[in-house]
Design a protein with these regions (language model features):
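Outer-membrane pore/translocation modules
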Residues: 1-37, 90, 95-98, 151
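Outer membrane beta-barrel transmembrane domains
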Residues: 40-45, 49-152
């Protein structure tokens, strides 16, 4: 099935713009990303738009909290891979893509886990707000993101 492929093996272009500003003790951010296949193979994942808006509040140097709203719109798969012809819904290119709106809350805390002075550990809980997926796709549930950052 297409969802189990590591890539569509196409040359892709991702362009975006990010704006971050400060208002009082808050950081406000917006980001727009567009992803498309330039050199298409027999099949490619559909064009994708991502829009993120967030607010972040720092509490001292070591702790921050954030809230984020994310919108994603992805077209269905273009083309067909003749080696993916199993009689299952995941082999149908029309069962991919759609629109999703997520809401996330997160926190970031300074750390010296590996002895550095500029390390952070971040975590974010992502909850689906609205899902309009194409074809026969399972609804998404919550997800948890854990990240580590080091600034050199």
């Amino acid at each position: 099935p297409y969802g189990m492929q590591s890539s569509d093996r196409s040359r892709r272009l991702t362009v975006g713009i990010t704006n971050v500003s400060t208002l009082g003790g808050y950081r406000l951010g917006n980001q727009l990303l567009f992803d498309t296949a330039l050199a298409k193979k027999s099949w490619t994942y559909g064009d994708q738009w991502n829009v993120n808006s967030w607010v972040q509040r720092d509490f001292g140097h070591d702790l921050s909290f954030s809230a984020r709203l994310h919108y994603k719109s992805q077209q269905s798969i273009n083309g067909r891979d003749v080696s993916i012809m199993a009689p299952v819904q995941t082999a149908n290119p029309d069962n991919y893509g759609g629109q999703v709106v997520d809401f996330a809350v997160g926190m970031s805390v300074a750390s010296n886990m590996f002895g550095g002075n500029h390390e952070k550990i971040g975590m974010e809980l992502v909850l689906p707000v609205k899902q309009n997926k194409r074809g026969l796709q399972m609804e998404s549930n919550w997800s948890f993101i854990l990240g580590y950052e080091i600034t050199l």
